Amino acid sequence: MSEDNLKLWNDLKAVPREAKKTIQAGRLKGMTDIKPQWRLQIMTEQFGAVGFGWYYEVAKTWTETYNTEVSVHVQLNLYVNIGGGWSKPISGIGGSMLISNEKIKDYENDLYDTKFKPYHSDEAYKMATTDALSVAMKQLGVAADVYMGLSDSKYDKKPAQTVNQIKASTVNK
């Protein structure tokens, strides 16, 4: 595989510290979340404005129900323009909870209710779309360093080294 094949990937893979945040709670606690606005920015830097140098189309939306909870899912196709030609569809599927059962907090008394109650997210479709976009963009290399574990969100003191830089530094010693 030539470096030419990896040029786009290498241009998109590094995530600046200010575009990352550590997830503070839930099943993903301690993992890295990448700010969605950064993804839009890096795509615009690489391909041009959305709608001109890149765009996406929602192919399908659907919901799934499990007991009393409902999740929403989005399948979309991402397209990028390279050298005047449009790519084939780059598919991404994402999801988010539309209705979930949660313990409701009584903020006045700083207590949680003992019963679970349904919570409806008015941002679920947007969040599922954002998730699907991140899955599609990941295939181009967007934020690859984070997904490959080459960027440590907790101790991020310097830019992540690429695998090639790490290999080169060990070979030259």
List each model region and its residues:
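N-terminal, Lys/Arg- and Ser/Thr-rich interaction peptides
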Residues: M1-L40
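Positively charged, aromatic-enriched nucleic acid-contacting surfaces
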Residues: R39-T162
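Interfaces that engage single-stranded nucleic acids at replication/repair/recombination sites
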Residues: S2-K7, K154-K173
